[in-house]
Design a protein with these regions (language model features):
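Short, amphipathic alpha-helical interaction segments positioned at domain boundaries
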Residues: 116-156
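A short, conserved structural fragment
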Residues: 96-109
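C-terminal accessory/interaction regions of large nucleic acid-associated machines
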Residues: 78-80, 87, 104
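Conserved segment of the helicase C-terminal RecA-like domain
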Residues: 30-51
Length: 157
């Protein structure tokens, strides 16, 4: 039986094909699934340069604005780009701050936005808030690498 992070149920064996971006996400999944065994399949963490990451995320924002009624699913963003939900919450708040969009509704699962347009991504790249977000991105990548390289018995405690 295959399930996604939307519908985690108890199971005997849990297999990760995409690694969680942070310990919090891993712990939530383990708590809900309560597996007897955990397998981490071979995985290459998504590591993008800043411009590529923002370009991809911006494309996701535009898609949501034009095709999803402005609804941005945070779990979907996190899963697709391999970063924590908090990264995307902070990015959307920053995009609003620089005038790219207006957030009309928000909760832990999704944001609904009114897209204004993106004229210059350097407004984001040169922001001190983006530097903090980038540090979070680096932490996500380091956590995913730790799942590949470290003793999993220690990580899973």
């Amino acid at each position: 039986r295959v399930c996604s992070r939307y519908e985690i149920t108890k199971c005997d064996v849990l297999m990760f094909f995409d690694y969680p971006a942070d310990k919090k996400t891993l712990d939530i999944i383990l708590e809900k699934a309560q597996p007897k065994k955990v397998h981490f399949m071979s995985y290459e963490p998504k590591v993008m340069d800043e411009a590529e990451f923002l370009k991809t995320f911006t494309g996701m924002v535009k898609f949501a604005a034009h095709n999803m009624g402005g609804k941005i699913d945070l779990v979907r963003c996190a899963g697709f780009l391999g970063k924590s939900i908090e990264v995307f919450q902070r990015l959307l708040d920053l995009y609003e701050e620089v005038g790219f969009l207006t957030v009309t509704d928000r909760n832990n699962a999704f944001y609904i936005i009114d897209f204004k347009g993106i004229d210059d991504l350097s407004k984001v790249l040169h922001s001190t808030k983006y530097a903090e977000i980038f540090d979070m991105i680096v932490e996500c990548e380091a956590f995913q690498r730790s799942l590949l390289e470290d003793d999993l018995a220690e990580v899973l405690l």
